[in-house]
Structures are given as C-alpha cells and as structure tokens.
Amino acid sequence: MLDLKFIRDNLDLVKRSIKARGLVLDIDKLIYLDDKRKKLITKIGELNAKRNENSSKMQENLDKVLKISLIETGKILKKQLIDLEEELERVSVDFDLENKKVPNILSPDVPIGSSEEDNFEIKRVGVVPQFDFKPKDHLELGRDLDLLDFDRAREISGSKFYYLKNEAVFLEIALINFSLNKLRDKGFDVFITPDVAREFIVDGIGFNPRGNESNIYKIEDTDKYLVGTSEITLGGYYYNKIIDLTLPIRMAGFSHCFRKEAGAYGQLSKGLYRVHQFSKVEMFCFCKAEESGVIHDEFLSIQEQIFTELEIPYRVLNICSFDLGSPAYKKYDIEAWMPGRDGKGGYGEVTSTSNCTDYQSRRLKIRYKDQDGQNKFAHMVNGTAIATTRVIISILENFQDQKGGVRIPKSLVKYTGFDYIPFKN
C-alpha cells in the first residue's frame, strides 16, 4: 500500500496512476474516511479523559445527590464511548478496504496504454526457426513422443490439469536444477517454499484482482490459500522484521503454483500454456530504496541469460500501465517464440519481473535501518526464473525435427542425461 501522507501530498500523481491503469477508484473517499477516522480517535480520547475525570471525582467524599449525578454521567459517557468505538471500527474497516485498492504509482518510463497491445517491445533476441516441414504444436508432440496426457488428467483432476510422462518428467526437473544452480552461483539463497500461505500474507503481497474473483484457491474453512507463485511466501519471509540490508537479500524459491485461470480458454490458452498447476522457480530481492531499479534490471538480465542459454528466441517488453498488477511500479516481460502458437507461431509470455518498491513491505511491515539509523520500508523486487510448463512448450516446438523427435538444448543435457527425445510409434 502507499503511505497516506504520500497520497495526500501527491494526490494528482496518485489519481493519474489510477486512471492510467484503467481502474476506477474514489481516492477522495479514502481521504474522507481517513479524516473521519482521525476525528473519531480524537473524540474517543476526549471522552476517555472526561470519563477518567468523572471517575476521579467519584472517589471524593460527596453527598448522595452529587454521587448519583456522577454515576449517571459515567453511564452516559460509557454509552457514548461504546457508540464511537463501534463507529470507529466500521470506519476503519472501510478505510482499510479503500486503502488496499490504491495501486502503486508508475515509473515515468512505463508506457501508458489501455490493453496489452500497448506494451512496448524493447528488443528481440535469437533467430526464429524456419522449418522445411509443417511443425507440430506441443500437444501433437506430447502425444507422438508420449510426454503428455491431458485426457487422463481431465478424468482424474478436471480440465487444465495434465500428466507429464517419460522424458518430460526429466525435462521439468532439469529446468528446475538448471535455474536453481545458476541462481545459487549468482549469490542467491535457495529455498523450497511452502505451497500454502495465510490470508494476511497473500493480502500483504497485494494480489488485487481487477474484478471480484481471486485467481488463487482458498482452502475451505481456513485462513489459508494455495499460492499462485512463491513470490507470496518469499515476500512474506521477513514479515514484521527489521532486516540487515547492508547487502541486498537475494532469494530463489521453488514451488508449485496453483491458479484458477477462470475464463482462460481458446487457442492461445490451450495445452500447457495456461493450467491450474505448474512448477516455478522465482527470484526475489529485499533491498534499499535506492537499489531497487538496479536489481530490477539485474533480474531481467538473468532472465535473458537463461533463455539465451536455452537457445530459445525471445523478445523483451516494457509492460504498459493497464497490464500492471497493483503492486508493480514497473514490469518487464519476456515472451518466447512458440512455433505452434495460434496455428502460425507467435510469442508467448514466459517470465515477468516487477519492481514493487515499498508497496508490499509497507503492508508486511518489513523494514531496514538507513545510514542515519531511521527505519525505512524495504524495496521488494520479484521475477520468474523458470515457469516449467511454458518453457517445455518452447523447447518441444522450437527444437523438433523432420523425424518427429526433439533436440534438448545443450545447457540442459547434463541435467536430463539425454540430448534427444525420439519419435515413438
């Protein structure tokens, strides 16, 4: 969330950010509720002082009539306090709800747009493969190479679940090991994180849906959710702590990810591209305010290194205002070339990295001491290292050959133990 003083002092900036994101929020209502809350707190303080004064007088040696009068006054004050405290509770709940809706401000270089078509392409890297045969999509390859089974998964678990089989199992594990080893070599602390988080942590990370429907699963009769990303559990790791940020804290977390993906159907969402469960390695960093921009660029550089070493053609996008999540100050996406996408080939999102500044840490009370010994809220940066399902799509579709098999990128062979997946009759 944003600091209330910052909102008051930069009201036009905050309103422009809300409008640029395509959100409809009444920021003046938030200010009104904050003013009302403060007035109620002041009134409650004044009434408590009167009540204490009234109680002190009752300790004195008084005649019966005056004592009865003080008792009646005490009852009136008590009732007034109860009413005001109940009103304060209602106003505070409304205030918190409105406060959580306010998104982060935007970096000055975020493109202003009204759809994903307005995302700005920064560059393209790699050569898109030219086949002298009709390439298959990953669903055909998964069937012909006996790697994927959606039909049995649909019977057992429902739509948008899948079985990985045979070499695809080792390919997923190889991608995880490849990315975790790279991040460890770059100084990241490596974690396997819980797949469940408590509601206040999910809320603190700021997963604000545009509609009323959350994209993650709540566990019935609990305050817990299945995580949609280990950003949630890594980001919550230092909840309510003052941390040492002499150096940035870089973390890499492996987790399963669970998402509802309601309404996600059609050619562009088929197969492994948009599923209810997948595995992912996430990068996360806690740093000082002045370091988050550099860390954000560092995360993008690591993502580019990963896809360059995997030999997958990709492009980098600066994400426009409409396409940003509420916590993000700035976001980059990498989209990989997928020859089977939409029947003719196209780029599909495989990673994102976001600088969330102190938007998340303010909710989660994660602080550090600056050089003057003052508590400051940490800046938090996140980014995908590997989301296995979409990278498997890219590998199968880009490295297929005329014999119907698939070559494994050289950087993965030491992790898979094989360099080729042959066609199976």
Curated annotation (Swiss-Prot):
Name the enzyme group at the top EC level.
Answer: ligase
Q: Does the keyword RNA-binding apply?
A: no
UniProt pathway annotation: Aminoacyl-tRNA biosynthesis; selenocysteinyl-tRNA(Sec) biosynthesis; L-seryl-tRNA(Sec) from L-serine and tRNA(Sec): step 1/1
Query: What processes does the entry annotate via GO biological process terms?
Result: selenocysteine biosynthetic process; seryl-tRNA aminoacylation
- Gene Ontology CC terms: cytosol
Q: How does it assemble?
A: Homodimer. The tRNA molecule binds across the dimer.
Record protein name field: Serine--tRNA ligase
The organism's lineage is: Bacteria, Pseudomonadati, Spirochaetota, Spirochaetia, Spirochaetales
Whichever gene encodes this chain, its name is serS
